[in-house]
């Protein structure tokens, strides 16, 4: 009974979270509102499309379920475009060890030449840093929620990430 009440209570809000792309330096590159759904394939597909258009060839993206997303991406209408631009889907370092060995050898960041010590866990670090944003946007209008999130990530990029690049 209590679960039904909770679902109804939170059901009045359309936005349930954000899906972000973070570069290896920690800059927020793209954000998408998740609307009345959990993590669905449409969010990373939209982000990949945006990044391919902005940055072009030879991009790689780490995702907790990068192995599954690789299949989704290749079967989508974006698949041909992603293959043409040599996009690679990878599994983040800490999540990859839950996958089977063949998946790890093919997708785990540890085994990909050229990535160095990158763990592709920038989104996890960013979400950890941005946890204080959630209570301030919980009851906001859609406009004010987007405004607060945009301001947070502008501040994050300019005054935290950019300022710390030279350290």
Regions found by a protein language model. Give the residues of each.
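Catalytic-core elements of nucleic-acid end-processing and repair enzymes
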Residues: 1-167
